[in-house]
Amino acid sequence: MEESETVLKLRLQLKEAEEERIKAAQYGLELLESQSDLQNQLEEQRNEMTSTIENLEQEKYSLQREVELKNRMLESLTSECENIRQQQKLCLEQLQEQLERNHHRELSEIKDKLEKLKAELDEARLSEKQLKHKLEYQSEVLANKSEELRMMSERVHETMSSEMLTLQLEKTELESAKANLEQEVNELQYREQQLLLTNGTQSRQLERLQDEKEDREKEAVGYFKALEKAREANQDLQAQLDIALQQAQDPNSKGNSLFAEVEDRRAEMERQLISMKVQFQSLQKQHAFSRQQMHRMKVQIATLLQLKGSQSDPEQLERLQAMVAQKNSEFETLVMKVRQLEKSQQICENGPVANSSDGLGQGDETYYVDLLKMKLVNSSKEIEKIKDELSLQRMKALAESQRVLDLERKLFANDRHLKLSQGENMKLRVNLDEMKMKYEPDEIAKIRTQKRRKEQLPLDCAIDNTSATVTSGSQAHGLSDAIPEDMCPAESTVHRNLLKEDSSLSTKEQDLSSVAVKPIEPANGQPPKERKRVRIVENENDNQDINKRNTNNCSVTSTSPRSASEESTSESKRFDEEQEKRKQERKSRLRAPPVLHVPSKPAATTQCPQQ
């Protein structure tokens, strides 16, 4: 029984185990199926993830490329924007400069027109004033003539003798001579006023031309700076173009390895080195070309300055020749007038003697004769007074003209000396540059700082001033000795006062020149070099000697200040001797004034600009 129970239990257990095994198999199958499903799902998810990652990577790469492109485009756009800004800035600066130039040009034109209008207005006012004065004078002369005509018409009815008629005729002739002399005095005054006006206008025009010259020089400097900037910009662009071409042609510029990066850096450094070499060579060529151009320009400027300093002004020569011809014609007319007056005076002196022999028997007309003689004496006194006044005015005009001529001579000599010194200075600079290029080529290439140079006065100015004062003093003494003996005391005193003023002015100028300009001794203790000078002496022989000296000594040599002072003293003595000779000749021929003969081609040293 127990065995059957155990068999039953075992069978039950076996059934249960089979049932469990069947269930486990079923569960295992279900798990396998679920696992395979999960694996399939996982594969699908993995594939999806890889595809998405690849897409993201592609998108990332494309985005990076796009970002790089955008950055490049942005850089190009910024560079283009900067270039456009610079171009607009340059255009704006050019427009501003052009507007400023146009403005300056218009201002200069307006100033020129204003100066011309002012000069025309001054001339019109002066001419109007002179015409008014002439009209008043002519009206007075007309009134006097009408009064004389009325008196003559009243006296025609009266019975008069031939002597009275001759005396009246002489009186009318003397009055007409007086009127002519007054008219000449007025014309000389008008001419002096016109000369003063033209001198003022010319001085204003000279100042305006100097201002225009400075403006033109500033414009030239601005143009040169702009040209240098354009050249520098062109060189930079050329270097950038060379670098870009080298980068485009370099095959080793691509790669991601370390060696490729090193190669890229080396190529970049080589490109930079090549660009620097190209820039250096271009700068060297430009520097050599600019040095050659500057050297040629300096040589040309020196030759032009020498030519300009040596040659004389043809307009000035023609003007001086015309003035000399005019003065000669005036002297000839004055000599003819003096001869006519002497003839008329002789006739008048012979006439009363013949009439006095006829009038011995006419005792009744002695009263009228005495009266007419008294009138004649009074008229002769008035004529002498008018002559004295005329001589005073002439002496004043001569003194003023002499001062003007002296000042113009000094100005011309200073201008010529300045031009010669500028030419010599330019020559010395050219020689200095040549020596530096020959012996110090490396130091010239260095950047030199701009230094200010002091312009010293030439040493010849002091001696020129002293010689001018000596000549002015000798001329004053000569003029004081040349006062004629038959001059009235009032005229002689006025003449002496004028000469004293001239001498005092000359001594003041000498003192100022001696104080202002002193000879500067060099550092080595040698005496300063000075130039030879030629003084202006109013004599034909001296002019011929000066011409010979100028033709023989074309090159300017240097002499000591002691020899120059000795020359000035010897020339002053010679001038005094010539003045004494002239005084003796003037005394020997009182009534025959000499005619001044001036050569048609005056020397270049005796010329001065006549306004």
Curated annotation (Swiss-Prot):
Instruction: Write out the annotated subcellular location.
Output: Chromosome, Centromere, Kinetochore
Any GO BP annotation: establishment of mitotic spindle orientation
User: Which is one GO molecular function term here?
Assistant: kinetochore binding
Renumbered residue ranges of the record's region Disordered: 499-611
Q: List the disulfide bonds.
A: none
Bias-annotated ranges (Basic and acidic residues): 499-511, 570-583
List compositional bias (Polar residues) regions by residue number: 549-567
- Keywords for this protein: Cell cycle, Cell division, Centromere, Chromosome, Coiled coil, Kinetochore, Mitosis
One GO term describing the cellular component: nucleus
Coiled-coil residues are 1-288
Q: Which family does it belong to?
A: Belongs to the Spindly family.
Task: Provide the function of this protein.
Answer: Required for the localization of dynein and dynactin to the mitotic kintochore. Dynein is believed to control the initial lateral interaction between the kinetochore and spindle microtubules and to facilitate the subsequent formation of end-on kinetochore-microtubule attachments mediated by the NDC80 complex. May act as an adapter protein linking the dynein motor complex to various cargos.
State the protein's name: Protein Spindly
